[in-house]
Amino acid sequence: MPKNACRATNTKSKKQTGRKPYTPTANNKELKMTKPAKPFIPLNIAVLTVSDTRTLDEDTSGKYLSDSLVEAGHTLAERALTTDCIYQIRAMVSKWIADPNVHAVITTGGTGFYIRDSMPEAVSPLFDKEVQGFGEMFRALSKDEIGMSTLQSRAVAGMANNTAIFCLPGSTGACRTGWEGILKEQLDNRTRPCNFVPHLMRVNPTHD
């Protein structure tokens, strides 16, 4: 039967029954559309700064990330600084990956193209899965701020032993872009339709 014939038959049926189209009231809409708010789940997050020149006192990027995650309700598991040495970076990140009390690691520095920039090379072998969209999204957001210079950012992320590792550039502005534009929401279990928190709880994640 043609679609228009079906439509005509259905219209006639509605006229015969005299049934009015359902119009949700404010109360009905609230009952049907609103889900109970999820309680916030605080994470234990470690922050690593990679720099050959800064000290912790001079580390504005690491301080920004530490302050921001605490302000968001998370716990700063540890904050550290290491030189741009591939093996020192890998050792520090590996320690946190092996610690069941650390849910996520955020690093700053070492993602450029200078000879000593080795963050991606240090952490990529540790990944069980790479979060490819992180670098793509970071560069897309950065383009609005620094134009095509964003091509020189090698921001990377991955999952290892149910721990998320996010590697940001060394500038405080880049850390702000990464936190405000991506990580603040994706490390919040209330973010829909999905976020990273279920993958960090040492259980198989499920959708609700």
What are these regions (language model features)?
Residues P2-R7, K12-D208:
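Non-catalytic beta/alpha edge segments that cap or flank active sites
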